[in-house]
Amino acid sequence: MEPMERAEPESAYELFRRGSGLLAQRHPGAAAVVLERCLTLEPGKASIIEALGRAYFELGDHARAAERFQAMVDANPLADYAHFGLGLSHLRLGHAAPGRRHLRMAVFLKPENPDYQRALRRVEAG
């Protein structure tokens, strides 16, 4: 009988791909678990933080989503998607003023994005 081989731990890249795949398949809870492991291997990596923000948002954990998107905005104030996600998260948490402010910033940074435009119009319409 041959000794069992130990599986190599997954790399950050493999974890990110798996987590992103789970997110695309609409499994945000499983994606969040995998992406949190990935983040421990690559702390501060914007793509991982963004995917985690999306996963938490889709789970309905808007406070955690806001934390992740805020970390992205802090690291890169010109990250349009981070402002968009942060704005939507704030709105879901009942924080209208910061939500509106971040959606406006997303539109300012990327005015050609119809999703950003639509979200801002909805908020400003009341």
What role is predicted for each listed range?
Residues 6-7, 40, 74, 108:
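Structural signature of alpha-solenoid helical repeat scaffolds
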Residues 12, 46-47, 80-81, 114-115:
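Helix-start (N-cap) detector for alpha-helical repeat units in TPR-like alpha-solenoids
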